[in-house]
Amino acid sequence: MEENVTYKAVCIVEDEEKIRLLADFTREEILRLLSVKPMTETQLSQKLGLTKAAIGYHLHLLAEADMVHIEKVEAEKHGILQKYYSPAAALFIVDPDKIPKDVKTYFTQTQIQFLRGL
């Protein structure tokens, strides 16, 4: 069930729908955690303090947009399959000229927070 997917170092995001997906703190954190190492829904839910259902919802949206993929599947005791997710790229950079007006504030605030941390 493992997918043969090419991993990119950097992905420039220009598609408005993908940009809207990235304008969400939870999805941003999921991608950040997955860029460190592949993780399961359970591991992500424990790290982020969210339910597995919430994580599953966000992973589904990211997978539909080809921003994450299943890197491997492992069977646990009792036959439960654990899917390990990885991002399609180590870093997603949003093209500032393509950001829809309704989410521009989110990215501006995110950039300000990033610069304050430098």
Question: Where in this protein do the model-derived segments appear?
Answer:
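Key DNA-contact positions within bacterial/archaeal DNA-binding proteins
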Residues: 53
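Short capping segments at the starts of secondary-structure elements
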Residues: 25, 36-43
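Glycine-centered, phosphate/nucleic-acid-interacting loop/turn motifs that mediate DNA/RNA or nucleotide
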Residues: 66-67
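Residues within the DNA-recognition helix of helix-turn-helix
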Residues: 58
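Conserved segment of winged-helix/HTH DNA-binding domains
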Residues: 14-15, 19, 75-117
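A short acidic, leucine-rich amphipathic alpha-helix
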Residues: 43-49, 62
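N-terminal leader segment of winged-helix/HTH proteins
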Residues: 1-21
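Pre-recognition alpha-helix immediately N-terminal to the DNA-recognition helix
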Residues: 28-32
